[in-house]
Regions:
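Alpha-helical transmembrane segments
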Residues: 163-167
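Folded, non-transmembrane soluble domains that reside on the lumenal/extracytoplasmic side of membranes
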Residues: 1-162
Length: 167
């Protein structure tokens, strides 16, 4: 039903063999750069079908199962393309809902993604959709927030070490 999480993690996961190796790499590089710059994660998954699941339910369940986004920031985005079902859905973590509301994402699907898909241009449709999502969400989080969060976890430990060193 659900594909297993890729190990190592990939941002572009095509279980339909729709995208060329070159297109996958170009899109992967774009999403790696976005994640490094913002700490947010966008994953794209192409599956043949969602089976008996509604596409929204499938997308949210897959996003939870794979753990897309930083857990403490809940800043993941999952673009799911069910190719044989001819459906697209974009799910966001709560941390990005303010800048990526459902109405905006529906507009991205209708205006950027689907017109390209109808012409058989899947890589271009995904790229166009990602460009709009990235532009809208770029300022929401930055990589420094993740570094601060990691540092905050070690402050009590560092305080104990400093105390021991003084004594």
């Amino acid at each position: 039903e659900f594909p297993p999480a890729p190990n190592p993690f990939h941002y572009i996961n095509d279980y339909t063999n729709t995208l060329s190796t070159e297109h996958k790499q170009i899109l992967e590089n774009k999403l790696i750069a976005y994640s490094k710059e913002t700490s947010s994660q966008i994953a794209v998954v192409l599956v043949p079908t969602t089976g008996e699941y509604e596409i929204a339910d499938y997308t949210f369940a897959l996003g939870d199962k794979w753990g897309i986004g930083r857990k403490n920031l809940n800043n993941g985005v999952l673009m799911l393309i069910a190719k044989d079902d001819r459906k697209v859905f974009i799910a966001t973590g709560q941390g990005l809902e303010g800048v990526l509301p459902d109405a905006f994402l529906s507009q991205v699907i209708r205006s950027a993604i689907l017109p390209q898909f109808k012409q058989g241009q899947y890589a271009q449709g995904i790229n166009d959709g990602l460009n709009q999502i990235i532009a809208a969400s770029k300022g929401e989080f930055d990589a420094a927030q993740v570094e601060e969060d990691v540092f905050d976890k070690y402050i009590p430990f560092l305080m104990v070490l400093a105390f021991i060193a003084i004594v």
